[in-house]
């Protein structure tokens, strides 16, 4: 028996449609032009094919310009790429091809792997297929039919995928012209709606199902966008990112390296360690008034990690430690700490705490180790051993809001000192699986929502805020701080997390004003997150042109002739006395050669001394990236460079002292 379908539109209006009505029918009932522009529908927020019969719910007609259409554009482009490959190289097997961040890929089984030279050929064929504007259509097949058809085509990987689909689940087959593939969908109306704003990016190897015991396939990555302008912008950012790649800069600037014997751990060179220590020193100064710096052990018995819960839910990411020698009675299992928090709770618990002592703020530049798959490692950005600028605040419920605001002020101030102006702060709320009562979460989320509103109001709109529903940790809600770099990329760095779990697990308490035991609120706080990763972000943000105060090498004194070497030594000594890191270059080379060489290693200031400068007791200053030279007296140069090389927090301190004098 037929019945009507009730649809609610974005403007709140409700209309009835006959059963069996499709999304395309609904679009046509509004206007022919809308139906022509439509690529899909969203029913209760879920994207569906235009050809799907509708059911009761909230409906939106999705056009190609809609942000949500980008996923469909990329999905359809992946299918067209697969069709192009099989047209060009018959017998090639198509395996899987998902949409990923900024693009898509497909894995292929081919006797001779693809090379980068094949990509333009595939792109040309893709444009031909798109120009055909074949409609996408969907069929539902039985498991047996799907296996029979794919087996007949020699698609053994597709047969395996069909076998993996649970019994009773529909097998959807999408056609574009005569070509078809197994796919969950949805797709747009036709291949022509993909457009031509796409590019195939690279070829890589990939094991079938990610298992090294399986055959190696060839993966082709691509990207697709709404418009050519968006594609061009994306490619520009990629080119900029490649120029700014911190791994390349690390080599050029002689900062660090990695090697096979220590996967995911950094070998810091002298200059790199200098800038790392400058960052630590800066962070340490920012904490010296409000925090006590502590140090928890690197290696702890697994029983502590069992109590914390890490051994149960994080063990696969932990490094287990046992005694190497056979001649020992100690058979206990230890682990390198992946996090500092359990150690800090032990320090808090050591001795009775009164409510009068709260908040207790502990900070540690703690070396932690976490296992990451080798394929996930990426320079300083993704490592196995790193340093956290970690802090934990133990406070009362009533102090939580003030502490979160205090943390926020510190985080924003630090980011501003490093030149990051565009910051987004988002509150992640309770997930489905969590510890703690609803009342506890209600209280924490209410407090943190008020804090979020205060952050936005105090910044007068400069700081953007938002909510991430259900994205909180299982132990409490959290703030996430995301900063935007010089080429528009976003980096999530800082966090403020409220924890109801660990204090309870470890039995941490303080004595309240009524002499009763109370569980403290524990707030986890990180600003840089990983110090190594933050340095990688800084290197890429500045393209190696680091601010003078955090530069690994601040000045090179280079002489034009040997007659100026003695004066050059005096200049270098004066600059070192003023606190700058200085090297000299008195080689018998032309000055332009020296300048070019030091520019490659991103030395921010080259102080040039010749015979005339020695006689006049002056210098010429050459800045990285500039052809101009600035002449000034030695005294002026020392004063100017020492002032510029002073860290922002020390400048503020000096200015406050001057005002108070």
Swiss-Prot record:
Main location: cytoplasm
Keywords: Aminoacyl-tRNA synthetase, ATP-binding, Cytoplasm, Ligase, Metal-binding, Nucleotide-binding, Protein biosynthesis, RNA-binding, tRNA-binding, Zinc
Molecular-function GO term, any one: ATP binding
GO biological processes: threonyl-tRNA aminoacylation
Reactions performed catalytically: tRNA(Thr) + L-threonine + ATP = L-threonyl-tRNA(Thr) + AMP + diphosphate + H(+)
Record EC number: 6.1.1.3
Heme among keywords: no
Subunit annotation: Homodimer.
Family: Belongs to the class-II aminoacyl-tRNA synthetase family.
Reported function: Catalyzes the attachment of threonine to tRNA(Thr) in a two-step reaction: L-threonine is first activated by ATP to form Thr-AMP and then transferred to the acceptor end of tRNA(Thr). Also edits incorrectly charged L-seryl-tRNA(Thr).
Protein name as catalogued: Threonine--tRNA ligase
